[in-house]
C-alpha cells in the first residue's frame, strides 16, 4: 500500500493549495488589521499539556512516544499550546496579548469511524489577559469581519453563555444535572424527556432549556421569567449588554441566534460560547467555534495565577467547501509568466541566464525553463494547455524571440 496515504490522511493538490492559501492569507490580513500577531507553537506537545485544560480526552489525541518515554501527542487544537506559550514565554510583555495562528491539527476519529479525516487546518485568534464585555464584543465582531471578507455566501453565529446555562441548570440535583447537561450538549431530546425527574417542575425546566434558542430578544424574554441565582443574573445582564453592543457597532445587524442550550459536556468555557455556521448545497457547515475560558491560563501558569482569555478557531476546510460553489476562490493554480526555451543544446547557458535576468528584473514573475527538448508545435501546445503567457525562444548568438 505504499502508493496510498494512510487511512484518514489526504494530499492537497496545487489548485486546492492555492485556494486554501487565499483563505488563510485573507484571514491573516484581517487578524493583522485588528492588531493580532502571529504565533507558531510546536506540533508536538506533552500529553498532560494537551489534557490539562479539561477539553481533550486521551482517545482524541494521536499519541507519540520518544526515547525518553514521555507521553506526547500531536496537537488536536491550538488554544492549549498558545496559552502555555503565553504564560511561560511572554510573561513580561504588555497586556492584553492579541495572538493569531494558522496551523494544522490532528484528531483521532470517534470509535467505529476508522478512515475518517485525521488532519485539519485551522486559523484563529486568542485574546489573552482581557475580560469583560468589550473583549467579548471584539471577538464576535472579528469573527463576523473574517466571514464577510471571505464573502461566505450564507452564515450566522450561534451564541450561548456557559455561565448562564450553568446557572439555569443549578436547581437540578447533581447527578441529574450532569445527565441533563449531557443531553443538551448532544441534542438528545428523547433521552432528556425520559430522565427520572423528582417533580414536573424540573422536567418542564429541562424541556424549556432544550428549546432556549432563537432570536435574542425572544430567548431573553423567556429567561427573565426563570429563577436565577446572583451569578445567573450577572451573566444575563452581561449577555444583554454584549448583544446590544455588537448590534450597535456595525452598519448591519449581526446574523445572531441565541442558544442557551449551547454547552459542552465538560467545564472548559466560563462565559460566552459561540459557533459560526455556513450553508452549502443545503447542508450546514461548522465554520468555526470559540468562547471565553477564564480558568485555562491559570492551569499553565507556573504560580497558577488565573487570567481571562477568549478566542476562536475557523475551520479552513469548511470555509473552502462553502466557497467552492462561488467564483470567489482562485480557479487555477498560479500561472507561469514566461517559458524560456533553448532551441539548441548550445543555447542552454543563454536560456538559463535569460530566465534568471527576468526573475531579477521583476521578482513577482514566475519563469520556467523548458526541459523536454520538444519541437515548436509541442511547446506551443504545452504553453496553451498550462496558461503560460509568454514563450521566449533562445538561440546562441541571436536575439531572443518573444511570443
Swiss-Prot record:
Give the primary localization class. Answer: cytoplasm
Entry keyword Zinc: no
Sorted keywords for this record are:
Amino-acid biosynthesis, Cytoplasm, Histidine biosynthesis
Q: What Gene3D superfamilies does the annotation carry?
A: Bira Bifunctional Protein, Domain 2
List cellular component terms (GO). Answer: cytoplasm
Q: What does this protein do?
A: Required for the first step of histidine biosynthesis. May allow the feedback regulation of ATP phosphoribosyltransferase activity by histidine.
User: What does the subunit comment say?
Assistant: Heteromultimer composed of HisG and HisZ subunits.
What's the protein here called? ATP phosphoribosyltransferase regulatory subunit
Organism from which the protein derives: Crocosphaera subtropica (strain ATCC 51142 / BH68) (Cyanothece sp. (strain ATCC 51142))
Amino acid at each position: 500500500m505504499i502508493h496510498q496515504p494512510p487511512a484518514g490522511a489526504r494530499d492537497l493538490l496545487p489548485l486546492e493549495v492555492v485556494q486554501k492559501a487565499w483563505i488563510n492569507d485573507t484571514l491573516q490580513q484581517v487578524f493583522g488589521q485588528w492588531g493580532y500577531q502571529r504565533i507558531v507553537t510546536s506540533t508536538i506537545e506533552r500529553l498532560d499539556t494537551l489534557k490539562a485544560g479539561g477539553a481533550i480526552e486521551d482517545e482524541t489525541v494521536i499519541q507519540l512516544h520518544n526515547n525518553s518515554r514521555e507521553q506526547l501527542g500531536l496537537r488536536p487544537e491550538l488554544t492549549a499550546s498558545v496559552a502555555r506559550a503565553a504564560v511561560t514565554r511572554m510573561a513580561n510583555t504588555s497586556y492584553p496579548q492579541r495572538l493569531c495562528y494558522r496551523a494544522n491539527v490532528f484528531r483521532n476519529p470517534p470509535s467505529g469511524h476508522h478512515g475518517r479525516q485525521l488532519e485539519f487546518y485551522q486559523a484563529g485568534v486568542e485574546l489573552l489577559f482581557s475580560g469583560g464585555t468589550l473583549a467579548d464584543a471584539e471577538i464576535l465582531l472579528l469573527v463576523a469581519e473574517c466571514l464577510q471578507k471571505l464573502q461566505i455566501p450564507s452564515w450566522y453565529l450561534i451564541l450561548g453563555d456557559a455561565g448562564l446555562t450553568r446557572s439555569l441548570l443549578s436547581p437540578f440535583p447533581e447527578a441529574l444535572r450532569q445527565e441533563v447537561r449531557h443531553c443538551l450538549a448532544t441534542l438528545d431530546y428523547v433521552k432528556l424527556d425520559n430522565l427520572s425527574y423528582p417533580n414536573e417542575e424540573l422536567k418542564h425546566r429541562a424541556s424549556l432549556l432544550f428549546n432556549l434558542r432563537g432570536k435574542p430578544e425572544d430567548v431573553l424574554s423567556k429567561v427573565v421569567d426563570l429563577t436565577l441565582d446572583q451569578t445567573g443574573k450577572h451573566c444575563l445582564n452581561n449577555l444583554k449588554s454584549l448583544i446590544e453592543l455588537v448590534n450597535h457597532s456595525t452598519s448591519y445587524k449581526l446574523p445572531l441566534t441565541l442558544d442557551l442550550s449551547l454547552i459542552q459536556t465538560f467545564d472548559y468555557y466560563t462565559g460566552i460560547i459561540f459557533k459560526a455556521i455556513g450553508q452549502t448545497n443545503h447542508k450546514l457547515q461548522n465554520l468555526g467555534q470559540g468562547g471565553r475560558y477564564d480558568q485555562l491560563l491559570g492551569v499553565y501558569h507556573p504560580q497558577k495565577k488565573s487570567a481571562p482569555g477568549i478566542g476562536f478557531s475557523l475551520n479552513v476546510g469548511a470555509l473552502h467547501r462553502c466557497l467552492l460553489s462561488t467564483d470567489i476562490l482562485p480557479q487555477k493554480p498560479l500561472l507561469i509568466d514566461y517559458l524560456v526555451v533553448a532551441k539548441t543544446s548550445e543555447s542552454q547557458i543563454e536560456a538559463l541566464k535569460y530566465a534568471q535576468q527576468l526573475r531579477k528584473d521583476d521578482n513577482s514573475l514566475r519563469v520556467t525553463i523548458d526541459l523536454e527538448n520538444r519541437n515548436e508545435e509541442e511547446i506551443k501546445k504545452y504553453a496553451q494547455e498550462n496558461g503560460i503567457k509568454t514563450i521566449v525562444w533562445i538561440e546562441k548568438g541571436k536575439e531572443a524571440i518573444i511570443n
